Amino acid sequence: PFDYDKEVYTDMLWIAEGITSYYDDKTIHRMGMFSDEEYLGIIASQINRLENSPGKDIMSLAHSSMLAWVKAYLPTEESMNTTVSYYNKGMIAATMLDLEIRAKGKKCLDDVMTALYTDFYKKQGRGFTHEEFIGVCTEMAGKDMKPFFDNVIFSTKPLDYERIFSQYGLSLKDENAGKTVAWSGVVSSHGNGKTTISNIYSNSPAVDAGLSVHDEIIAINGWRVDGRLEDHDAKYGVNDSVEITYARDGKIYTAKLTYAKSTK
């Protein structure tokens, strides 16, 4: 049903890839190769990754799927701040969808996938639309699932983890709550004796200091940097200011960076 001589746009890659990612770990857990604690740790890690992605507030999951050709496979230094992964958020959405369907104790996401295969592929020889997918989820959940999709798939609203997970006696704990951790907003890499900025979080101290992606960080307060810049964050407190020496396009510059409280 697809013309592979040209791009095929869809807003459902989160289903093809995100749900697959969900079942990757779910299947191993079912086999007993992950303990309950290990499996919940994997979910928590994925949630942590998403919540630390500024792009989640800019791009919806459906939009991320649709723009895969021009965004996911053509990343820029702004991708971290403007896009969201349909693998990462898709996996979380699938987790929440399964839990929502299971709430009445009758059906689960397995039943949705089986029905899609039987009713659309086997009986009609075709795929399905988003509307049809929502319809099958509604049937299996025994309630209207459109609000779930409107909030989780088609918008950039914060995900309501508490409501979903509390139904199963689970809750999320912010391990940084109450802590004051200094943060520069830089994501850097270190190799061949050089520390280079890979990404910068939007609205961060690094942006205010005028630093840019690809800058080579040479020194902090006159001391040579050995390793990633963010590895030095723990040495400083919130509101501490440091002098950053860096190279850009062959020229040496200095900048004043004032650490902020980490939200990561």
Question: What residue spans do the PLM features occupy?
Answer:
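Zinc-dependent metallopeptidase catalytic helix centered on the HExxH motif
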Residues: 1-55
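Acidic/His metal-coordination segments adjacent to aromatic residues that form catalytic metal sites
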Residues: 2-6, 66-80
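Terminal peptide-recognition signature
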Residues: 20, 105-107, 149, 186, ...
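Solvent-exposed soluble domains appended to multi-pass membrane proteins
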Residues: 37, 62-63
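Amphipathic alpha-helical substructures
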Residues: 40, 74-76, 80-166
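PDZ/PDZ-like groove recognition
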Residues: 171-208, 213
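Conserved PDZ fold ligand-binding element
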Residues: 206-228
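PDZ-domain C-terminal substructure recognizer with occasional recognition of PDZ-binding tails
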Residues: 212, 230-264
